[in-house]
């Protein structure tokens, strides 16, 4: 029974020394097969031993031991199998991790070969013998030939070919991650930052800048494809018509610690765009925004692409040269494009002249323009595209030509496959391999890849493989030539770094001069006073809060009571005018004694209705609304007295904040006030003191009303004339004349006459009631005869009660919460909004811009000085070119 654990232990030791690799030969068994056979032997041996043990020992005294061992037998077997299973899983995981890289390479090669075979087979149907009319070597043939050579080398054990394959694999790995960090002193990234700073200072200056690589070429030269091959993404708009109508200032930033590929549009304040279809769409819209009548614009589009797979470069893509204007294009388009390109081709910019191999260099628009801007060819790099369209010997002669010599030479690239990639060719059986593509291209993209992104990535890989296979196949022709996109990238990195490095000292001198001028202006105009948009905003908010604090001290209970009392006085006058002053029996109130109890009851009920209408008119909401409006109006007055009056953004924010704070307590305050005045709706108890105050207030109120009526009547009389007004009034008072002609009187004159009659009657009534109030109405007993006094007393009680709760529920809450809420909303404002607010004032805008210019110049000068200090310890940089 002890044989099974011992054999398992021996087996584990043997398996531990067994190599876990995948054998390609069918005659060699894998470790899994050996392990399975050994496990079978273990089980058979253990079973045989157990049976033998039971048969040979039949003693009754040993039955308990036998039974216990039989029971433990499954446990031993199960434990052994579990240990073996765990070991198998461990070895399988080790084997999978060992072969993962190899499988990935095989998968990439298989997919590319399937694509090439599909293209070759489809080409056999449409072309003669599978060869294109352009004379290119079919990609599938190149890949197949390369694969056959590799297999033959492996069978023969040729060490030289193995070394070549290792070099190619190493090149592929180096291409996957850009090595900008290892190039020279890695100064390009810092100098591109300086260039970006200088562009912020003055983007239109041709002197205050560092060199860039300016890409020029005709529309069919493959200019856009060269840029996309450097970036590794398709993002530039293409089309049969001219789609590049504005310069594209492209900045590539190497981010070694990031797996994302993102795009920024700094001038549009759009950042971290991961969808390059969106980038392409935006570039198309920005270019198409240029009117057809203008065709091209000098306003650049600023685009920054960040990735671990791009070098640190600063490029400018210009509109392609044309030979003949189209019918829908302006006649001066050719001249406009030439003038725009000349602006960017000036020193110290590097010129990247793109020319197609199938076009004679004598007709190259790019070389012609570069020769005009750089006669000696010291700043020009020639790039020859579409080398696969010509014979290798001719391609070599183009790259090594002496007719059009350039100091930096020519670089040959192939940026496209012989035929465009069709989606149906992405899979072996006509279907897009979505799963495999996702595994390849979604790495580092956090799930952002889609079918279109996969297609773009596949195009770049296939293009790179095609270029690599072509130059490898024709290696003997391009021995002494500079070819491949990788070589172009390396050359651009070195040249740009050297050019920028050489331009640092003269640029530093210019920056110092500009800084001195800016500092002098800043001192003269603003006395070196530091001001930021945020500090300007906070200073104005502090002034606003101080004004609100003063308003809080002035706006106490008496102010609130006067506002509410004035409104209720007007309501009292409206009630009196409606229910009393139009009553024909008003004269009866002046008699010493009413004729009957019925008449007395009539005036008593009339007073109750008037009082009820006053108390049930919605005092809660009326008083709350009046208080709210008074606060908002005073807040507007405070804003108008500060510098915020010129800033609509902050004025709206302050007003909306105040409205929200007041609205939060509006309904609860109105309900509280309404509940407090509820007893006055049923019974109003007046003391003699209240009556006396109300009587005096009523007299003053009637006097003011009488004064206003007399003033208005006198104004009409002066405007029309006393005699003419008397005639009109006499005519209107005679009712029989209303049915006849107007005797030449205008409609306006008749309206003035009607108003004068009304005012005359109202003055007589007010004079009559004023005498009544002065001579009588001395006590509450006469409240039915003196409704003016009674209603005035009621309004006074309503006002006093409402003010108590308005002061507590609304005012105190507003003055406490408004500054807090205002600060909270101000913190939510972004830097862009704060800067926009500050620049609404022209003087402040000038202050901030001049100060920002001074700070940017200081920052650029500091960075340049640090690079120059470091550069002194580095000699012979230009010798690496």
UniProtKB/Swiss-Prot annotation:
Post-translational modification (record): Cleavage of the transit peptide by mitochondrial processing protease (MPP) produces a long integral membrane form of MGM1 (l-MGM1). Further processing by the rhomboid protease PCP1 produces a short peripheral membrane form of MGM1 (s-MGM1). Both isoforms are required for full activity.
Record-annotated membrane-spanning stretches: 73-92
Effect the entry attributes to changing residue 542 to A: Impaired dimerization
Residue intervals on the Mitochondrial intermembrane side: 93-881
Entry keyword annotation includes Transcription regulation: no
Residues noted as binding GTP in the record, renumbered to the chain: 220-225, 239, 386, 388, 415
Record's protein name: Dynamin-like GTPase MGM1, mitochondrial
Source organism of the structure: Saccharomyces cerevisiae (strain ATCC 204508 / S288c) (Baker's yeast)
Source lineage: Eukaryota, Fungi, Dikarya, Ascomycota, Saccharomycotina
